[in-house]
Amino acid sequence: RTCYKTYSDKSKTCPRGEDICYTKTWCDGFCSQRGKRVELGCAATCPKVKTGVEIKCCSTDYCNPFPVWNPR
């Protein structure tokens, strides 16, 4: 599996057994100015997240691009 790892669309071949790509987003103290924090990566299973954290998991190559931010 090949997943995006950074906002600049750098992709990475995932380690063996990590066949899920994910995009995790959440707000911090600068959310209103900078938008949500974003983490992209690979995992063996879709990661569990805390309240206030959104996650999208997918299982095809390049399926987790950096999300588009729409300023308010």
Swiss-Prot record:
SUPFAM superfamilies tied to this protein: Snake toxin-like
Main location: secreted
GO cellular component assignments: extracellular region
CDD domains (alphabetical): TFP_snake_toxin
Keywords: Acetylcholine receptor inhibiting toxin, Disulfide bond, Ion channel impairing toxin, Neurotoxin, Postsynaptic neurotoxin, Secreted, Toxin
Disulfide bonds: C3-C21, C14-C42, C27-C31, C46-C57, C58-C63
Tissues in which the protein is found: Expressed by the venom gland.
Subcellular location as annotated: Secreted
Pfam families given in the database record: Toxin_cobra-type
InterPro entries, alphabetized: Snake_3FTx, Snake_toxin-like_sf, Snake_toxin_con_site, Toxin_cobra-type
Domain of life of the organism encoding this protein: Eukaryota
Any one Gene Ontology molecular-function term assigned to this protein's record: toxin activity
Membership in a protein family: Belongs to the three-finger toxin family. Long-chain subfamily. Type II alpha-neurotoxin sub-subfamily.
Function per UniProt: Binds with high affinity to muscular (alpha-1/CHRNA1) and neuronal (alpha-7/CHRNA7) nicotinic acetylcholine receptor (nAChR) and inhibits acetylcholine from binding to the receptor, thereby impairing neuromuscular and neuronal transmission.
Record-given protein name: Alpha-elapitoxin-Djk2a
Taxonomic classification: Eukaryota, Metazoa, Chordata, Craniata, Vertebrata
